[in-house]
């Protein structure tokens, strides 16, 4: 029965892809790769258009973008043709794990440092280590006063393993597979065309489960040890965390009256002659143009 249930859940999850193939059969104006048959659908799911990359070859990810005027490899090694194991380790920890995962995790539950993101500065190639064990940049630990969501989430992990270790282990598995395991699988090179926090939403959901469990555990402990009204504690937790986050983050997440993407697409299309062909530099440039052309 368990095997049948697990199989059905896997099929149910993969069934969401059917929407793509159904829409492709309708031949919409924008039809990425046109996955309307088995072969094209297989290529679509495997992302064949993006080429092949190695999950384990970290050295290649360090220097893959070292051609032309791009000198990002200097953040990790003095010589891209002779990379040391120490430099590979520093690249994996400081860039792939810290900058491309832990920083995003901290944004969700600790606090993001302002609207304008800045990349960490390169260390000198002479003398100082290429990459030091620097703290996470772009993170403001005091943004919400105290990072209550993070603290209660940590308490939730402890409380969950103490009360129900089997289910806690299942949540931990979800947290790792949708977080750190994805970091290993993607083997991201530097630079990336955009922030990649959306790739780890599953791990954020898993930690949110522990925030809920931690809140319950905290209420139970306070009620048991101090004979305090649990409803008051629940109300304080319910109000303090989301209200403070909403108050501090509303402006940065409010997209009203921001027309940069609209203006960018409008001006680009207006620069073309009738029936002209416009070459774009990837999807970041293409999507607003599609919106302007097909919707507006």
Give the residues covered by each predicted segment:
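Membrane-interface catalytic loops of GT-C/OST-like multi-pass glycosylation enzymes that act
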Residues: 139-142, 164-168, 184-201, 254
């Amino acid at each position: 029965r368990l095997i049948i249930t697990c199989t059905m859940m896997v099929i149910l999850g993969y069934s969401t892809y059917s929407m793509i193939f159904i829409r492709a059969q309708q031949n919409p104006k924008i039809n990425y790769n046109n996955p309307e048959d088995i072969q094209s659908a297989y290529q679509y799911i495997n992302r064949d258009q993006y080429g092949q990359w190695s999950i384990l070859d970290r050295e290649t990810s360090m220097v893959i973008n070292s051609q032309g005027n791009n000198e990002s490899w200097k953040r990790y090694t003095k010589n891209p043709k002779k990379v040391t194991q120490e430099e590979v380790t520093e690249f994996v920890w400081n860039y792939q794990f810290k900058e491309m995962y832990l920083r995003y995790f901290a944004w969700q539950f600790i606090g993001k440092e302002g609207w304008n993101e800045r990349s960490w500065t390169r260390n000198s190639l002479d003398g100082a280590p290429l990459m030091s064990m620097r703290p996470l940049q772009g993170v403001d630990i005091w943004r919400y006063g105290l990072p209550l969501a993070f603290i209660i989430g940590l308490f939730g992990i402890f409380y969950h393993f103490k009360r129900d270790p089997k289910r806690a282990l299942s949540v931990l598995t979800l947290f790792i597979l949708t977080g750190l395991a994805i970091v290993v699988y993607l083997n991201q090179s530097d630079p990336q065309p955009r922030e990649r926090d959306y790739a780890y939403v599953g791990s954020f959901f898993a930690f949110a489960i522990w925030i809920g469990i931690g809140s319950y555990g905290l209420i139970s402990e306070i009620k048991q040890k101090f004979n305090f009204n649990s409803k008051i504690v629940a109300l304080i937790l319910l109000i303090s965390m989301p209200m403070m986050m909403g108050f501090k983050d509303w402006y940065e997440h409010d997209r009203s009256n921001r027309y940069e993407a609209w203006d960018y697409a409008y001006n680009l299309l207006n620069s073309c002659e009738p029936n002209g062909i416009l070459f774009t530099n990837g999807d970041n440039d293409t999507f607003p143009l599609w919106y302007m052309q097909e919707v507006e």
